[in-house]
Amino acid sequence: LNSITRLHRFSALVRSHIRDPRRLDAVTEIVGLDLFCPNDLYFFKPPGTGRPIAWHQDSWYFRNIYVSSVGDAIDQSTIGTWLALDDADEANGCLWVIPGSHRLGVIDHSQVESDDYLLQKRVTVSDEMEERAMPVEVPKGALVFFNNALLHRSTPNRSDRFRRAYIVHYMKATIQHTGNRPRFPEGTEHWGTPEMYICGQQLPGCVQTTLEKDSMDWDRALERTLTEDDIRISEP
């Protein structure tokens, strides 16, 4: 088991963590006062295993699903947070980044020609960029903030320790759905990814985080919106 996505849909504890004022103090300063959460993700990466993740940008994935209603680039409308649940270092497969790569904007991704990687899309980087890459070694409890256009990856866990992490993405409320990749059955009101309201305004014509009401009621949420793609479990 490598990861579980969208825990916020079914856990009040997770939702309270995502809305923790200590997080939002920083996020609202960087992104803005009106926010929703498009996705959260829990990585296990157990000792001696855990598939690597190739160089990629989260904004590339978001660009296929969302568009700004006010003309902002998608990489200027989102931010990622990465919470270390264990000490993270090179040995147990910490996060790697290429400093300054977010200034390149969103780069096209290509298919990974290997089943060894957790994600099947990647950015091919130059030797010069590879040389600038640096590990993000942080202690348990550290919270890393990064632009969603920042090129990042992680390596396998070659240690005898876990390297667990919890990732939350925040997005401006000025975002609209592109109409791509519907994730809910026909006949329901919910399209796009299962977003969560965070703070501020919900703007007309933009993403409306109606799932907040459903997610408080486990049975209703399961009956109306749960599909196999909602909680995706990746086998090692």
Task: Identify the meaning behind each predicted range.
Residues 1-55, 60-66, 110, 181, ...:
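Non-heme Fe(II)-dependent double-stranded beta-helix
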Residues 24, 28-36, 73-75, 85-91:
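Secondary-structure boundary elements
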Residues 33-35, 39-40, 51-53, 77-83, ...:
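Generic beta-strand structural signal
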Residues 41, 46, 57-59, 79, ...:
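Short, structured patches in soluble enzyme cores that scaffold and shape functional sites
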Residues 45, 98-105, 163, 169-175:
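Short edge-strand/loop segments of extracellular domains
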Residues 57-59, 64-67, 114-132, 162, ...:
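Short, surface-exposed loop/helix-turn segments at secondary-structure junctions
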Residues 75-78, 88-153:
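Double-stranded beta-helix
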Residues 143-145, 149-236:
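Non-heme Fe(II)/2-oxoglutarate
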